[in-house]
A protein has these predicted regions:
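Short catalytic-loop micro-motif centered on adjacent basic/acidic residues
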Residues: 1-4, 121-126, 153-156
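Polar interaction faces of repeat-based domains
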Residues: 133, 137-147
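C-terminal active-site-proximal or functional interface alpha/beta core segments in diverse enzymes
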Residues: 144-176
């Protein structure tokens, strides 16, 4: 089982609960990908979050035989969820409400560029076509500044997108 985006709110509490449950030796392993968004707030900044992440896969207190943090991977969050209708949509919503950015755009760009430039595999929660377009545009910018052949950036969830966006994702090497 993979949990991209760990923790959701309380690193120590969630980890202790997970380790306690996994101590019962269920017939599966758990692989964790840290949340750059949550750790930004918990650690007081992007550099502090990344420094903490650098210790996760090698610190025994955070790993067990069946629980492991994946090295050099991070989950970032673009726009809101499908079911809550908080995705960012290019054409908006018919009832006039607006989607939400889960991470302010300037912070998201700072995070994506920092992890990109430090050779992380980046996973991005993105649902609406505007949220995904923002990620596509930033990956293009990152490729222009610091080109990578096999960056393996991956979009998760993919609520709404069109064929031209899919082609652009393919051309940029974005996984879906």
């Amino acid at each position: 089982i993979a949990e991209p985006g760990f923790p959701s709110s309380d690193f120590d509490g969630e980890l202790q609960l997970l380790l306690q449950e996994m101590g019962k030796n269920p017939p599966y392993d758990v692989y964790l990908i840290p949340s750059g968004t949550q750790l930004f707030g918990m650690k007081g900044g992007n550099k502090e979050a990344m420094s903490f992440m650098e210790t996760l896969d090698t610190t025994r207190a955070y790993n067990r035989s069946n629980v492991n943090f994946l090295p050099k991977q991070v989950k970032l969050f673009s726009d809101g969820a499908i079911y809550s209708q908080l995705m960012q949509m290019k054409d908006g919503y018919t009832d006039g409400h607006h989607g939400e950015w889960m991470t302010p755009l300037s912070l998201f760009e700072e995070q994506l560029m920092m992890y990109w430039n430090n050779d992380y595999k980046i996973h991005v929660h993105a649902n609406g076509d505007l949220g995904q377009q923002m990620v596509i545009d930033l990956v293009q910018k990152a490729q222009n500044i610091n080109p990578k052949q096999d960056h393996r950036l991956t979009l998760h969830h993919m609520g709404y997108f069109d064929k031209p966006m899919a082609e652009k994702m393919k051309n940029l090497g974005i996984g879906i």
